[in-house]
Amino acid sequence: MKFAVIVLPGSNCDIDMFHAIKDELGEEAEYVWHTETSLDEYDGVLIPGGFSYGDYLRCGAIARFANIMPAVKKAAEEGKPVLGVCNGFQILQELGLLPGAMRRNKDLKFICRPVELIVQNNETLFTSSYGKGESITIPVAHGEGNFYCDEETLAGLQENNQIAFTYGTDINGSVADIAGVVNEKGNVLGMMPHPERAVDSLLGSADGLKLFQSIVKNWRETHVATA
């Protein structure tokens, strides 16, 4: 499986993402600069965290206009797995691929520490290696990770089982403690915590590795079955 790691001005988690795929999983990964216009040669798309364009105007608001973004939307429409982490999640929201918006954390402070997540849906291509209700430890690093949506949108997320992860405790004021959601089709995941920073027990947790393993496992099953 071959992954594209999108690199924008201000990205700072692209190397971690590349390491998780290339070194920990042994899969192919390439950095793709934001000026590129095609992702056709890739099987999966990863949008890492950071501060794209300095978070000016609004997190992800400028990045959504990058040359590569139409190709990201095309990949999502084609059913390819698309993962956005932290700033990547915010960008996916700005693109309209995922619902909701991000506000400043409730205490107006930047949070950078390991947190408990609860796997709410283990039937997605990103979470199938976890158990439903499993408690995992993944680090966060954000100042604007307070997920917000209106009641109607929240009801839809719950009804469609689109909430992939919630926080074990309220860390930032997110509606329903939401930490990660998928689109209705289930092939686009956005999450504020950083699974790429939890792929080796030496770093405190390897719980994030299962997420990347799930992507590869489901991709292989699908492509072997259709080959």
From Swiss-Prot:
InterPro entries hit by this protein: Class_I_gatase-like (IPR029062), PRibForGlyAmidine_synth_PurQ (IPR010075)
Domain of life: Bacteria
Organism: Bacillus licheniformis (strain ATCC 14580 / DSM 13 / JCM 2505 / CCUG 7422 / NBRC 12200 / NCIMB 9375 / NCTC 10341 / NRRL NRS-1264 / Gibson 46)
Catalytic activity of the protein: N(2)-formyl-N(1)-(5-phospho-beta-D-ribosyl)glycinamide + L-glutamine + ATP + H2O = 2-formamido-N(1)-(5-O-phospho-beta-D-ribosyl)acetamidine + L-glutamate + ADP + phosphate + H(+); L-glutamine + H2O = L-glutamate + NH4(+)
Pathway(s): Purine metabolism; IMP biosynthesis via de novo pathway; 5-amino-1-(5-phospho-D-ribosyl)imidazole from N(2)-formyl-N(1)-(5-phospho-D-ribosyl)glycinamide: step 1/2
Active site annotation, chain numbering: 86 (nucleophile), 194, 196
EC nos: 6.3.5.3, 3.5.1.2
Gene Ontology CC terms: cytoplasm
Underlying gene: purQ
Biological processes annotated in GO: 'de novo' IMP biosynthetic process
Protein name: Phosphoribosylformylglycinamidine synthase subunit PurQ
PANTHER family: PHOSPHORIBOSYLFORMYLGLYCINAMIDINE SYNTHASE SUBUNIT PURQ (PTHR47552:SF1)
Domain (Glutamine amidotransferase type-1) ranges: 3-225
Compartments reported by the entry: Cytoplasm
